[in-house]
């Protein structure tokens, strides 16, 4: 079993950049780029979401997600709720937060962070 999870908080309600998770970068929306980079780290990855539109996208593209309360004041709160739901079934020793607007994060950074948590 993997002892590390990467959680990516994503929501549509950004005021400075509306609909940011669906901003196209090439052929894919930003949220998919972030997921792909995190997935390449070989850790378990989930999107922590609160919007039905994002849920529909995740379902249509087989991206693992956890629905959370839309009233969370921060991505960290969203991650906390998602983790509590996931840990009803699986326990993780290490939790890594990758922001949903980091499409160019390299999986090596995620792996390096995890190595330094030992």
Functional labels for PLM-detected ranges:
Residues 17-20, 114-118:
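N-terminal start-of-chain detector that recognizes signal peptides
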Residues 39-44, 60-64, 118:
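Short glycine/proline-enriched coil/turn segments at helix->beta-strand junctions
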Residues 1-2, 92:
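Intrinsic-disorder/low-complexity regions
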Residues 52-115:
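Short phosphate-binding loop-to-helix
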Residues 28, 36, 85, 115-116:
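Residues within well-ordered alpha-helical secondary structure of globular protein domains
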Residues 3-49:
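N-terminal glycine-rich phosphate-binding loop and ensuing alpha1 helix
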């Amino acid at each position: 079993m993997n002892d590390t999870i990467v959680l990516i908080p994503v929501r549509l309600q950004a005021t400075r950049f509306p609909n940011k998770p669906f901003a196209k970068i090439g052929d894919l929306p930003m949220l998919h780029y972030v997921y792909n980079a995190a997935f390449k780290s070989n850790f378990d990855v989930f999107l922590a979401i609160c919007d039905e539109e994002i849920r529909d996208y995740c379902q249509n593209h087989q991206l693992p997600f956890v629905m959370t309360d839309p009233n969370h004041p921060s991505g960290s709160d969203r991650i906390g709720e998602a983790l509590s739901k996931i840990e009803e079934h699986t326990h993780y020793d290490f939790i890594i937060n990758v922001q949903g607007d980091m499409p160019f994060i390299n999986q090596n950074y995620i792996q390096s962070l995890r190595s330094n948590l030992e």
